[in-house]
């Protein structure tokens, strides 16, 4: 069973029925769900909820998509801090380092369209995109 951390852009694609990425993001998340479990970090959930009408709506959507909320934990936060401390941010916001650290600590891979995560060179972070999964 493979655990997949889901990034914000995938959720937005699905909920907004994005004409360019919506169908591929939905197909990718469905495939990942068939292969194992889906999780999301506190940062992703908070950013997602900010775009919803209410916290209840955000939680309902995540439950419908079978995306489980998992705390980052001490190890995930430490990984994020270590990587951020060693590297220039390269324009990345700190939340991105927390999302990457969360994925390293709790998942086998991170599903995202933001391929900048791969360029972060976070040890142990496996980045997959809808395009790479569905190719």
Placement of each model-derived feature along the sequence:
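Acidic, PIN/NYN-like endoribonuclease modules and their adjacent C-terminal/linker elements
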Residues: 3, 100, 104-135
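Conserved glycosyltransferase catalytic-site signature
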Residues: 8, 42, 95-97
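A short acidic, often aromatic-flanked loop/helix-cap motif at beta-alpha or helix-coil junctions
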Residues: 46-47, 75-79, 132-135
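Short loop->beta-strand "edge-of-pocket" segments that line small-molecule binding or catalytic clefts
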Residues: 4, 37-40, 65-70, 109
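Residues at the C-termini of beta-strands that transition into short coil/loop
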Residues: 42, 71-73, 129-131
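Short, well-structured N-terminal submotif of metal-dependent ribonuclease cores
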Residues: 1-40, 49-60, 128, 134-135
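Active-site neighborhoods of divalent-metal-dependent phosphate/nucleic-acid chemistry enzymes
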Residues: 68-115
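A generic structural signal for short hydrophobic patches within well-formed alpha-helices
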Residues: 11, 45, 117-118
């Amino acid at each position: 069973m493979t655990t997949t951390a889901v990034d914000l852009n995938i959720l937005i694609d699905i909920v907004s029925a994005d004409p360019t990425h919506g169908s591929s993001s939905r197909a990718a998340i469905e495939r990942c769900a068939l292969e194992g479990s889906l999780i999301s970090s506190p940062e992703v959930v908070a950013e997602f909820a900010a775009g919803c009408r209410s916290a209840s709506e955000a939680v309902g959507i995540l439950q419908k998509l079978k995306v489980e909320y998992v705390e980052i934990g001490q190890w995930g936060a430490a990984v994020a801090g270590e990587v951020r401390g060693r590297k220039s941010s390269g324009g990345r916001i700190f939340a991105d380092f927390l999302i990457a650290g969360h994925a390293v600590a709790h998942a086998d891979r991170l599903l995202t369209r933001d391929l900048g995560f791969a360029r972060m060179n976070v040890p142990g972070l496996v980045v997959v995109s809808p395009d790479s999964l569905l190719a």
